[in-house]
Amino acid sequence: MIIKNGKVFQEDGSYKVTDLYVENGRIVASADEVTDKTELDASGLKILPGLVDIHSHGAVRHDFSDADVDGLRTILQYEKSQGITSYCPTSMTLPKEELLKIFQTAKDVEQDETCARIVGINMEGPFLDPVKKGAHVEGYIRKPDIEFFRACNEAAGGMIKLVTLAPNMEGSEEFIRELHNEVVISIGHTAADYGCAAEAMKEGALHVTHLYNAMNSMGHREPGVIGAAADNQDCMVEMIGDGIHIHPVTVRNTFRLFGDSRVVLISDSMMATGMANGLYELGGQEVTMKDRKATLADGTIAGSATCLFDCMKCVISMGVPEREAILAATANPARSIGIYNEVGSLTPGKRADIVLTDEELNIVKVL
């Protein structure tokens, strides 16, 4: 296929009016490498890389933690329709037996061209700090456990790419030292202070789970996890871009503080995403969704009800430059879990995960 005359998003964040060549599901460098010369006229359209969501629990009334193959497939189909072509289903804090079944589901689900591709699993619990549990069930939280993690990863067929860890919990140092070369260790759901977080980063935990949420605020005398992450140039940070979790001023300042290569936009979406107001569930707890805000009975925010593409558009509406927002939803998440060689930009050799939009970034077609 040859996609003609579109404004193609470049690796440097600029747009270039040019043709894009696709052969056997990969982007190639020239028309000479294309056997199927079918043309798609993209005049007046923007061409973006497919988005990469590394932190999402579910959508359209299904949750990864349901351990249901058909439900997971439905999630993947919804995500693809919304311009998300690479996806990390994300678990909640649950008993080990349930987690093993959940991770097996990701191995077994049937995927085709109608689905976002599972590029890894995000294991958000159970190695969290009860003080900052958020929407996770405290009774299932446990200390960091290397063998527990490895059993889960074995059930997942080695697909776990991310695991959240509270570095102030007993056993975290050993966990980080032992596993940081096997999985991306993400600091989150923690009351850790700056010193604790900085030491964990020094040991190899170079990712932060949904920055600002479920952690202490950054103070001028105690910078906490946020300050430690800002100070460590190798640390990447997730940020929920739904317009509910974080104030627009903080969103804009985060991009200024961390630059255009370290912010990873995530949806943190749950099963109410793509649905009407009503009652839903997350991690075994009832959630009320009203006007895109999902909360537990006590008012705790319980994930988002917004897909990543809409999160990206939301932060642009807050004043984040378009190029930075797109990079934060494509290249940065891909780099953060080590798959940028395959996805995240429209570069020859990579997967032809392509989203065509109008000038206002309304989706026209997803390839």
Residue ranges and their predicted role:
Residues 6, 335, 345-367:
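C-terminal cap of metal-dependent C-N hydrolases
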Residues 57, 61, 73-102, 116-129, ...:
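Divalent metal-dependent hydrolysis catalytic cores, especially in the metallo-beta-lactamase
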Residues 95-101, 168-170, 186-191, 240-252, ...:
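Active-site glycine- and acidic-residue-rich loops that bind
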Residues 196-324, 329, 335-340, 360-362:
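Active-site-adjacent C-terminal substructures of enzyme catalytic domains
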